[in-house]
Amino acid sequence: MSTEALTLNNVTVDLRQQRILDGIHLDVSPGSFTCLLGPSGCGKTTLLRAIAGFTPLSQGDIRLGARSITHLPPEKRHTAMVFQSYALWPHMSVGDNLGYPLKLRGVPRAERKRRIAAMLERLELGGFESRAVTQLSGGQRQRIALGRALIIDPPLLLLDEPLSNLDAAIRRSLRSELRRLQKSLGITTIMVTHDQEEALQMADQIVLMRAGKVIQVAAPQTLYQQPADLGVARFLGVDNTVTRHEQDPTVGSRAATFGFRTRDARINEPLRPATLTRKGRVTECVYTGDGYQISLDTNEAELFATANSPIALGTFAVLQVPESALIPFGPDDRHLPPLDRHEDIA
Amino acid sequence: MTTSSSQVHSLAVPNRRLPRISLGMLLVLPALTAILLLYALPLARSLVTAFRDSSGAWTTDHVVRAFSLYGRDMLFSVGVVSVSLALIAAISIAISGYLVLGATPWAVRLLRWLYRWPLFIPFVVTGQIARSFLATNGMMNNVLVETGLMASSSAQSFLDWRGLVLTFAWKQVPFVTLLLAGAMAAVDRSHIEAARNAGANRLRCLFEIVLPQAAPSLWVGLILSLVAMLSVLSVPMMLISGNPTMMTAMMAHRITYYGDYGIANALGLFSYALTAVTAWVYLRLTLRREATA
Ligand SMILES: Nc1ncnc2c1ncn2[C@@H]1O[C@H](COP(=O)(O)OP(=O)(O)OP(=O)(O)O)[C@@H](O)[C@H]1O
Ligand SMILES: [Mg+2]
């Protein structure tokens, strides 16, 4: 089975008279890696389960390639899902877990054995066939769960926070391993995560969700530099917002608010042209490893900036953000399109 | 600090451990006495009686006579119990499976509410109900004839082995289902979803994912049902008039009409053996499972 495109059209889900997903439209191109990103409870898992067939739609249509799968039971959809808890069957060995999807498809025993061995090699778990799944480490279970999903060459791979149960080091290595595997197989993949760093690193396309709605669909760079509104921006680490002043850079002259990231704001450096500056009293100074994070109390807001050396509390300091790092928002808190910049400059 | 002081304490007064043991003994004693007096002793006595003649000499006479007189009843008992267990297992699996995997919420709720009722009806009443339901002119045949599904001439009594099997199943299915459905509900939901995602339909999910994980409870339920069926007297007495019948009926017959405890106990011996073998098989199975897990 080759990889296929996924199309969601007005997908709406109600659970117990409550609207959980609200008119979701989404196009996922074949072979791409899409991340569903959003705060806890926004409906990411529900969307994934709706695609896999475990949550009925109250409206809308889901298409895989040319066929509609909206009304198919889960077992007929041929999607492959990796569960957050891995859901390995404890009464089966590692080999039987991997082989069960093949058994269901009537693959003969010898062929099954060969493909299980090949998959274990690929997962760098060669010779694990007869192990009990209860004796595996978290990272090994995760890989077996992934192998069980991939062994049938599914047209669509669905991952629900596959890395969130693992510790930071394994997580980083599995992240690139997973991405490499996905690229080499060219399989259309949708991954749920609430870790923005994970999404930015892995995805071709990020779907940002909030309260059951899709807010923005964009490539990682676009999402990072041009978040659709202030809420999205805050979710993507834009911790600071200031109202625009007269003397501020001309970029986005229609902007009511500027957002910027803490690491783009410097403290007490020689003033450069075309920068946004604010003055305030230092209220906190925290070592972060790369430098110091300074909290600055200005008249209008508390702002955060980065300094190379510690700064005494209570002193006054000047915060400076280069024009290129400013993200302009209109009076309605929506991002002003980059087109505006050109107009303003002209 | 605390450890050293307690050590000193126990060194200084070594006999302080003694009262503690006797306190433990005191707590266990009532249960132990009850088991010894009410269970172990009668069991031993009945075993011994099975191998003693009236003068008190050892003999295998009772056992041999029990087999020659009641061999057919023993086979009948084994047959009825086996068929009943198979039926109980099949229905319990079907009901629990539907409770866990059913797709129609209201039907699942209704079934969950309905299936337990027979649990609260004692065996005697069950026997009475079955009698009036299964007899030649009982309710079942009446309904079949009234609705025109069966000619009145072909109405026959179900008060034989079939009646026994149906009655036992009716009484024991809710109990086994209660155990099995509980165990199935405890199976992680994501295990079922992972299987369906892998391409398993509901039926395969039931037999290949859910049932294997819940099987220990099914075995426990079936063994307890076996014991119940081998020990109940009222149902075979009420449903079956002639021969062959269940061993309990024969044991009661032997005692009430002949005062012959020897043969009655020899028959009892057979019941013990049957349950013991089943329990042993079950233990072997669970131990092997635990060793591989
Ligand atoms: N079976 C259900 N019945 C009713 N409401 C549900 C059910 N499952 C989820 N919800 C609700 O739907 C909303 C979305 O849940 P969902 O699990 O999709 O969130 P999520 O984005 O995956 O969150 P997280 O990041 O915490 O996993 C939540 O408000 C939740 O309370
Ligand atoms: Mg979730």
Label every model-predicted segment.
Chain B
Residues 1-20:
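Short, Lys/Arg-rich, polar N-terminal cytosolic tail immediately upstream
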Residues 58-67:
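A short amphipathic helical element positioned immediately N-terminal to and/or at the very start
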Residues 115, 192-193:
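Short alpha-helical segment that forms part of, or immediately flanks, the ligand-binding pocket
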Residues 187-191, 290-291:
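Short glycine/proline-centered loop/turn elements that form peptide/ligand docking sites
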Residues 198-200, 212:
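Glycine/proline-centered hinge or cleavage motifs at structural transition points of membrane proteins
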Residues 285-293:
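Short cytosolic juxtamembrane segments of multi-pass membrane proteins
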Residues 20-52, 69-153, 159-185, 213, ...:
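Membrane-water interface segments at the C-terminal ends of transmembrane alpha-helices
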Residues 52-56, 233-261:
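Glycine-rich helix-loop "coupling/hinge" segments at transmembrane-helix boundaries
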